[in-house]
UniProtKB/Swiss-Prot annotation:
Its EC number is 6.1.1.7. Pfam families: DHHA1, tRNA-synt_2c, tRNA_SAD. Binds 1 zinc ion per subunit. Keywords: Aminoacyl-tRNA synthetase, ATP-binding, Cytoplasm, Ligase, Metal-binding, Nucleotide-binding, Protein biosynthesis, RNA-binding, tRNA-binding, Zinc. Its cofactor is Zn(2+). The keyword ATP-binding applies. This is Alanine--tRNA ligase. The gene is alaS. GO terms for molecular function: alanine-tRNA ligase activity; aminoacyl-tRNA deacylase activity; ATP binding; tRNA binding; zinc ion binding. It is found in: Cytoplasm. Catalyzes the attachment of alanine to tRNA(Ala) in a two-step reaction: alanine is first activated by ATP to form Ala-AMP and then transferred to the acceptor end of tRNA(Ala). Also edits incorrectly charged Ser-tRNA(Ala) and Gly-tRNA(Ala) via its editing domain. HAMAP family: Ala_tRNA_synth_B (MF_00036_B). Belongs to the class-II aminoacyl-tRNA synthetase family.
């Protein structure tokens, strides 16, 4: 049975609109990942956005529970039901039907569509929800309905907001396999398995904890697809179902082991984590040192450790990830489209960790011999595994689990505090809804007229201070936010900065508009007050001329993404952008730096579309129709039922709410000024067009004239070659080795930069001069940084050291344990590379 399709078709027949799975990275600062089906409807439930035209919804939502409040990572592989990535089937009512219909729908689907026997089904309800008990008694004997407390059967979104009792459907898997003391309905055993949770959102909890009935109660339900699949196949473990069979077969082939062997938990960990890695990479999450990228890294490294237990000492996970991409190609087309990029990025991350995995395992195994009688693992060693060898703490604890031990958390935290604190993203976020509730209740969304005009007459609805508390009037030299009845100012969004401009009254300027932002559907402009204004004043709102330059750069960004996909492949997707009046910045998914030929092709393609003078076309259509037309959409964006589509004939088509030029010819010209790395798997292009393009051409022409003068040669290339020959001749003389040498614990440490000379030869000379050495020498040449490093009788491998430092330069190193070299084109990161080189060496020496 195709459970997903069966579920969605069932609820579509019951009048529900079917919604696609939203991205795993939600447009919600309070969440690390999308962890439930209701996440994409959160703003509807809280009243921030209006109810959709069809107030019933159904979805099959991909969810991630690793990191953050909901973290199942440590349990995966050791239990029958835990996953990092899973699909949640759900039906929702936004003030339409309530308990009676929700219970009826659930019972019908479970017994008729899924075919579960009514005699095997049990129900839990909240202890005070007598209404639900009466409704369930129509289908289930009262002795199979159990009342439970708030802990088990009361759901709330946060400390305040919508909440209500819930009711769960359980299935009895039979006493044949479950005979423990806790295997009774309501016990902690696995015999009675929850399959569906129905949440009855009927209350609003105030900040002081008081519950008030909601005027329009709602429904939110969730049922795990993997769990249902296993039950239908009479499997006692989710991983034993056909959903995971292709992955188990691949792992068995790679390891030459049987799934039913002692390594079964490791099979399950690798299978689960391969799914998570595939979907996260395909949806634009990349390996990183913080936030979501670090969770992704932890998942991969945990999988590699379990592969290591099964004898896999080389990269392997990328092969299992490839199977995931093929398995889900029909239901999630983007996995197939991005398979090459996903597999490549996974392989490179594996290679990086495998360089330190074996050394880290040696330290771990050695330290196990010194466990104290309480089986507490030294926190300092746990920190060294984390800091030097890249072992996340949960990975170390996972390894300790099989030895009945755990890490000294206090000791680990002390080491962490002593280290220089890296900036960390706080994914908990702020509950801003309460700050705006009064404004949302008082004002309807203001009208945006900026697509049609850059100037309009408008009434001042209100002024607000920096905390968005309403104030009655605005006086000279104040900075305040204003809400206009209608506004021509475009609010920051889609990477484009907010409009600036001015307000006029009685033919005089009364305020400068510094910025424009949208909060919960309201467009606010930040003002610098020149003359006193009060609520109710009628003003003329005028957008500044820089709007046109922003529009040029915004349209150029669309053409750029299209060109990148044509040159590099369809795996390219937007990872971030900034659109200003004098430049654009575009971040995109791609595993390696673009070479000169690729950059030239991209630039030529964009300019070719500019010179074609293509007219822009703006259409409004249903989201599914837009996607069918091939419109590009952001994974991180949450779209409405109807969307705005901007296209430039065959050159580009995207979902976009921004301001654009009417014709590509108005962009003028396009130049890429820089290409660099942002993080693993994410590249950045910076470019200019319009007036900024012309200004750059003027400056470069001026520099060219100056170069001719300095070289005393109208042929600049010939003049440079002559100068290079002169420099080359001067370098034939021996180069002095004026590099700083520090002696630490008997080892000579050399980290520095030279302007000329053969750095490989310098390393050789240093090695011959010193008995114990750690040396890394950098040199700028041909718009790149090259480095060479040598190790002699010191506790670090040259190839590991060089490769780690090279990554910050956008490159990769290679070599042996005693000598290695590397290079990269991110010249601006030289100082950071020097710092990393020295700190890595110091850690190795101090260890």
């Amino acid at each position: 049975m195709d459970i997903r399709n069966e579920f969605l078709q069932f609820f579509q027949n019951k009048g529900h609109a079917v919604y696609p799975s939203m991205p795993l990275v939600p447009n919600d600062a309070t969440l690390l990942f999308t962890n439930a089906g209701m996440v994409q409807f959160k703003d509807i439930f809280t009243g921030i956005v209006p109810r959709p035209s069809i107030p019933r919804a159904a979805s099959s939502q991909l969810c991630m529970r690793a990191g953050g409040k909901h973290n199942d990572l440590e349990n995966v592989g050791y239990t029958a039901r835990h996953h990092t990535l899973f699909e949640m089937l759900g039906n929702f009512s936004f003030g339409d039907y309530f308990k009676e219909e929700a219970i009826l729908f659930a019972w019908e689907f479970v017994t008729k569509n899924l075919g579960f026997k009514p005699k095997d089904l049990y129900i839990s309800v909240h202890e005070k929800d007598d209404e639900a008990v009466k409704l369930w008694e129509k289908f289930v004997p009262v002795d199979r309905i159990k009342k439970m407390g708030d802990k088990d059967n009361f759901w709330q979104m946060g400390d305040s907001g919508p909440c209500g009792p819930c009711s769960e459907i359980y299935i009895d898997q039979g006493e044949k396999h479950f005979k423990g003391s806790e295997d009774y309905f309501g016990g902690e055993g696995d015999r009675f398995l929850e399959i569906w949770n129905l949440v009855f959102m009927q209350y609003e909890r105030s900040n002081d904890g008081v519950l008030s009935p909601l005027p329009k109660p709602s429904i939110d339900t969730g049922m795990g697809l993997e769990r249902v699949q296993a039950l239908l196949e009479h499997k006692l473990n989710n991983f034993d179902s056909s959903l995971f069979a292709p992955l188990m077969e691949e792992i068995s082939e790679l390891t030459s082991l049987d799934y039913a062997s002692e390594f079964q938990p490791s099979f399950r960990v690798v299978a689960d984590h391969a799914r998570a890695v595939a979907f996260l990479l395909a949806q634009g999450v990349h390996f990183n040192k913080e936030g979501r990228g670090y969770v992704l890294r932890r998942i991969l490294r945990r999988a590699l450790r379990h592969g290591y237990l099964m004898g896999l000492k080389e990269a392997f996970l990328y092969k299992v990830v490839g199977v995931v991409c093929e398995q889900f190609a029909n239901t999630h087309a983007y996995l197939k489209e991005s398979k090459e990029m996903v597999v490549k990025e996974c392989f490179e991350e594996e290679e990086h960790f495998l360089e330190t995995l074996e050394s880290g395992m040696e330290l771990f195994n050695l330290s196990l011999k010194h466990l104290n009688e309480n089986k507490i693992f030294d926190g300092k060693i746990a920190f060294k595994l984390y800091d030097t060898f890249g072992f996340p703490l949960d990975l170390t604890n996972d390894m300790l689990r099989s030895h009945g031990a755990c890490a000294d958390m206090q000791g680990f935290e002390l080491c962490m505090q002593e280290q220089v604190k890296r900036s960390k993203a706080s994914w908990k976020g702020k509950q801003n809804n309460a700050d705006f509730s009064a404004i949302l209740n008082a004002y309807a969304p203001n009208v945006f007229v900026g697509y049609e005009t850059t100037e309009c007459s408008a009434k001042v609805l209100g002024f607000f201070d920096s905390d968005f508390k309403e104030i009655t009037d605005a006086n000279p030299n104040q900075e305040v936010w204003v809400l206009l009845e209608k506004t021509p100012f475009y609010a920051e969004g889609g990477g484009a900065i907010g409009d600036r401009g001015a307000l006029f009254k009685d033919n005089g300027e009364v305020a400068i508009v510094l910025d424009t932002k949208n909060f919960f559907g309201l467009n606010f402009s930040l003002l610098e007050i020149k003359k006193a204004l009060k609520k109710g004043d009628q003003v003329i709102a005028q957008v500044s001329d820089e709007r046109f330059e922003i529009a040029k750069h915004h349209s150029a960004t669309h053409l750029l993404q299209s060109a990148l996909r044509e040159v590099l492949g369809s795996h390219v997707s937007q990872a971030g952008s900034l659109v200003e009046s004098k430049r654009l910045r575009f971040d995109f998914s791609h595993a390696k730096a673009l070479n000169d030929e690729e950059l030239e092709k991209v630039e030529d393609l964009v300019n070719a579309q500019i010179f074609k003078h293509l007219n822009s076309q703006v259409e409004h259509m249903p989201l599914n129709q837009a996607k069918d037309k091939g419109a590009l959409a952001l994974f991180s964006e949450k779209y409405a039922e109807n969307v705005r589509v901007v296209s430039f004939k065959e050159a580009s088509i995207e979902l976009c709410g921004g301001i654009h030029v009417e014709n590509t010819g108005l962009i003028g010209g396009f130049r890429i000024v820089k290409e660099s790395g942002v993080s693993s798997g994410v590249r950045r292009i910076e470019a200019v067009c319009g007036k900024a393009f012309y200004q750059l051409a003027k400056e470069e022409n001026k520099e060219l004239k100056n170069a001719k003068t300095l070289l005393k040669n109208n042929d600049v290339i010939a003049g440079i070659n002559k100068l290079k020959e002169s420099v080359k001749n001067s370098q034939k003389a021996p180069v002095s080795m004026d590099l700083p040498v520090e002696k630490i614990h008997g080892v000579n440490l050399v980290v520095g930069v030279v302007e000329q000379g053969d750095i490989k030869e310098m390393i050789d000379r240093l090695k011959s001069k010193h008995e114990r050495l750690l040396a890394m020498v950098f040199k700028k040449e041909n718009e790149r940084i090259t480095l060479a490093c040598g190790v002699k009788n010191a506790p670090i491998k040259a190839n590991v050291w060089a490769n780690e430092v090279a990554q910050i330069l956008g490159g990769k190193g290679g070599g042996r344990g005693d000598f290695a070299s590397a290079g990269g084109k991110d010249i601006e990161n030289l100082q950071a590379a020097l710092n990393l080189a020295k700190n890595t060496a110091l850690k190795a020496l101090e260890g």
